[in-house]
UniProtKB/Swiss-Prot annotation:
A GO CC annotation given for this chain: mitochondrial inner membrane
Mitochondrial intermembrane-side segments: 80-428
Residue stretches of biased makeup (Basic and acidic residues): 124-138
Pfam family, one: NIF
The encoding gene: ttm50
Alphabetically ordered keywords of this record: Membrane, Mitochondrion, Mitochondrion inner membrane, Protein transport, Transit peptide, Translocation, Transmembrane, Transmembrane helix, Transport
Subunit details: Component of the TIM23 complex at least composed of Tim23, Tim17 (Tim17a1, Tim17a2 or Tim17b1) and a Tim50.
Protein's UniProt name: Mitochondrial import inner membrane translocase subunit TIM50-C
Entry GO MF terms: cysteine-type endopeptidase activator activity; protein serine/threonine phosphatase activity; protein tyrosine phosphatase activity
Length: 428
């Protein structure tokens, strides 16, 4: 029966080949082949895109991920904290709910060691250790500071008690017995405090006021010659100028013409150097500056009067007639007690072309030769000018012109008289 059915099936198939249904199947198979061809092209295109994406991913893994490792570390740290919190909640809920462990954590730790939990734990421990050390160091510093304040306060208190005892104790005679004073009959504590206050005022006056009432000795008596006028000179920036260089260090430069100035002024003036510098600085300089002894007296800082932060030269203690005293200085604050006795000279800064001392010689010579009774009148006139020496030069120039003009007029008046005499005598 099967053999009889096979030819029948074949015959049916052969019959179907000649029918329109066969053509339909053929068209369907062709369309399916075309669709497969398009799908194969699309698959190749997707394969190429996937290959390029793999290359980009490999490049990103080699370059961008190491730079982004700290950010990934922070994300992992947050996720780990969240996981631990979730685990605690799950433990509270039930023992069967076990938290899931991220399977990629060991892989990330191998790829990026800096993001591993072990490194995070070590860094946290080091940070805590540093904070603890800093806190301990701050505590030690604060203890040292408190100890320093305590020592300083104790020293100040001890110094205060010592000052009260030392400056407040009464004076004693050669036998060691206390000398009675105005505080003897007062309570003991009050005695010491008031004596200390009196001592403070004494040292304050010693600093502010001159060391002695008469700065200069009395004028010389005959047969010795006492110059009529007294010339008071500032040393710094009038006679010498301090100069400092790397090669020589500090040294004092002589003003141009200072030797001639001292020699000429010593003929008519009693020369006194009065400066606010210390004696240990002044005396060696004047010894080298004036080997001939033209400078008769030297007054230093202890002879000044300290007023409003300035060392002022108080001429009242000079023991000389102020009508005959001329002070040459560039600092107005140093002579503000007696401005009418001051002749302001420009401050010398060490330049070699300076010639003001030569003009000053001429000015002083005129005063001495004219026997001016009160030099303050002349000095008061020149005090109104910013540069008295320049004004003196201008006055001398005008005086010379006036003298020449007077001489010319005198000569012009004399010539007609000679002509008239010769006309009368000679008949011409």
């Amino acid at each position: 029966m099967s053999m009889s059915m096979a030819p029948a099936t074949v015959l049916q198939l052969l019959r179907g080949l000649s029918t329109p249904r066969l053509l339909t199947h053929i068209h369907q198979h062709r369309a399916l082949g075309n669709h497969y061809h398009h799908y194969h092209q699309h698959y190749q295109h997707q394969h190429h895109l996937l290959h390029h994406q793999q290359q980009y991913l490999r490049l990103f893994t080699c370059t961008a991920l190491p730079a982004a490792a700290p950010a990934l570390f922070s994300i992992l740290h947050t996720a780990r904290g969240y996981s631990s919190t979730t685990k605690q909640e799950a433990g509270a809920t039930g023992p069967n709910d076990a938290p899931e462990v991220a399977p990629n954590a060991p892989l990330l730790a191998k790829l990026f060691p800096q993001t591993s939990p072990e490194v995070d734990s070590n860094a946290e421990q080091e940070r805590k250790k540093r904070e603890e050390e800093e806190e301990k160091e701050n505590e030690r510093a604060w203890k040292r500071m408190k100890l320093g304040f305590a020592i300083f306060g104790g020293s100040a208190v001890a110094a205060g008690f010592w000052a009260v005892y030392e400056f407040g104790k009464p004076e004693v005679d050669p036998n060691g017995q206390p000398i009675e004073d105005e505080f003897t009959h007062k309570p003991l504590v009050q005695q010491y405090l008031q004596r200390m206050w009196k001592s403070i005022h004494y040292y304050q006056r010693m600093i502010q006021e001159p060391s002695r009432a008469k700065l200069l000795p009395d004028p010389l008596k005959p047969p010795y010659v006492q110059p009529r006028y007294t010339l008071v000179l500032e040393m710094k920036d009038v006679l010498v100028h301090p100069d400092w260089t790397y090669q020589t260090g500090w040294r004092f430069k002589k003003r141009p013409g200072v030797d001639h100035f001292l020699a000429e002024c010593a003929k008519d003036f009693e020369i006194v150097v009065f400066t606010a510098e210390q004696g240990m600085t002044v005396f060696p300089i004047l010894d080298a500056l004036d080997p001939n002894g033209y400078i008769m007296y030297r007054l230093v800082r202890d002879a000044t009067h300290f007023v409003d932060g300035h060392h002022v030269k108080n001429l009242d203690n000079l023991n000389r007639d102020l009508k005959k005293v001329i002070v040459v200085d560039w600092d107005a604050n140093a002579t503000k007690m007696h401005p009418d006795n001051t002749f302001g000279l420009a401050r010398w800064h060490g330049n070699d072309d300076d010639g003001q001392l030569l003009d000053l010689i001429a000015f002083l010579k005129i005063i001495a030769q004219n026997n001016v009774d009160d030099v303050r009148e002349v000095l008061h006139y020149y005090r109104q000018f910013d540069d008295p020496i320049n004004q003196f030069r201008e006055n001398q120039r005008k005086l010379a012109e006036q003298m020449l003009e007077a001489e010319r007029i005198e000569q012009s008046k004399t010539k007609p008289m000679v002509k008239q005499w010769s006309r009368n005598i000679l008949g011409r």
